[in-house]
Structures are given as structure tokens and as C-alpha cells.
């Protein structure tokens, strides 16, 4: 059976790995997952990520980040989902925890944070929020 929401699966794997204090988490890769991982790395929520081939399939390996023994990511949630897509214009993008968190948005100019999308004047699909 195919997976109905691979992005929700990615976020759940990250959340569960951090709760069990794993150093890294491995999952099937895609261009969108790699773009989300890049945003998480740029914003300082994960140490690093690597996309590599294993048995003819692409694998995404994300190194998780901790501060003082606690996970850096306190909250990671899917917003737009296959059954209910959420699209917002540049002026309606959510402000997560008054700027302490980020919303990851898929725009026509690529996957970016809501701050960069607002600065570029583009809206898009709100994939998830991270705090």
C-alpha cells in the first residue's frame, strides 16, 4: 500500500526520533523532503542532512540537534494535507509564535520559510510549522 502523505510521515519520524533521543533519522527521500530538510538546516533546527543511494532507492538521513539535552524542535506539525490543502497569499502567511518559530511554505520560487516568502512577495502552500 502506498503512503498517502509522505511529508506527514517525515515530520512524524523526526518528532518520534527526537522524543527517543536518536542522533539521526532515516527515511525515503524525495526532492520536496530534501528541500524541507534544507530549510530546517538553514533555520538551525537540524544539524545536517544527506541524500544517498541505497539499493537503488534514495535515502534521506537527517542528523538531529539537541540543546542542553533537549530537542531543538519543540513542535513540528503538518498544516496542509492531501485532504485539505492550505494556500495563503504573501500577506496572509502565518506568524508562528510571534516569529520564534517558522512556517515552511512551498512557493513558485521553491520551498522557503514564511519570512522569506513574505520578503519575496510570494504566497503558496503552507506545508508545516516548526517551533
UniProtKB/Swiss-Prot annotation:
PROSITE patterns: RIBOSOMAL_S8 (PS00053). GO terms for cellular component: ribonucleoprotein complex; ribosome. InterPro entries: Ribosomal_uS8 (IPR000630), Ribosomal_uS8_CS (IPR047863), Ribosomal_uS8_sf (IPR035987). Keywords: Ribonucleoprotein, Ribosomal protein, RNA-binding, rRNA-binding. GO terms for biological process: translation. GO terms for molecular function: rRNA binding; structural constituent of ribosome. It comes from the Bacteria. Pfam families: Ribosomal_S8. NCBIfam families: PRK00136.1. Part of the 30S ribosomal subunit. Contacts proteins S5 and S12. Belongs to the universal ribosomal protein uS8 family. This is Small ribosomal subunit protein uS8. It comes from Nitrosospira multiformis (strain ATCC 25196 / NCIMB 11849 / C 71).
